[in-house]
């Protein structure tokens, strides 16, 4: 299993399970709730006391950081089942609703998701407005968000 060549910064978090126990078939995107660089975002997930991580951080400037190898499960969504099958991406955002992201962050996130899907054989991303369909991967749904599993944005 490979990591994205688009990552221009790597700082591996100790907060993970190695290896993941499920084929990658899902993308989970979450807002970081701070306009951080990828480097700063990865640094946040270093303390073991944090008990959280993600596979990638996308910075406000379009930088991409690798926090947890794709072969490993991040601790991102409060659901081990989801995290074992998903690549989890934290995207720098404003710290209040509507949690806006910069154009550079949005473009980098789209490039990263495209790369992840190509490398992992995900032919199509399917979003549902129905939480049950997202959480249970019904009707082809293979996109989830943190708020599906915890009281988050």
Which stretches of residues belong to each language-model region?
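Cell-envelope and extracellular/periplasmic
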Residues: 33, 70, 82-98, 114-118, ...
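Short C-terminal domain-edge/linker segments immediately following a structured domain
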Residues: 58-63, 86-88, 118-123
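Basic/polar, cationic surfaces and motifs that engage anionic cell-wall
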Residues: 1-11, 16-21, 95-153
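N-terminal catalytic cores of peptidoglycan-degrading enzymes
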Residues: 1-83
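Structural preference for beta-strand elements that scaffold enzyme active sites
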Residues: 26, 86-88, 142-144
């Amino acid at each position: 299993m490979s990591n994205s060549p688009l990552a221009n910064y790597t700082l591996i978090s100790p907060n993970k399970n190695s290896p993941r126990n499920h084929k990658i078939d899902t993308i989970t995107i979450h807002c970081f709730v701070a306009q951080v660089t990828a480097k700063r975002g990865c640094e946040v997930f270093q303390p073991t006391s944090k008990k959280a991580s993600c596979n990638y951080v996308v910075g406000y400037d379009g930088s991409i950081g690798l926090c947890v190898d794709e072969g490993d499960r991040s601790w991102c969504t409060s659901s081990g089942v989801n995290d074992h099958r998903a690549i989890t991406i934290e995207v720098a955002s404003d710290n209040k609703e509507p949690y806006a992201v910069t154009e550079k962050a949005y473009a980098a996130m789209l490039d990263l998701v495209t790369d992840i899907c190509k490398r992992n054989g995900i032919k199509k991303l399917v979003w549902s407005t129905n939480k049950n369909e997202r959480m249970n991967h019904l009707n082809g749904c293979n996109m989830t968000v943190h708020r599906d599993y915890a009281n988050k944005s």
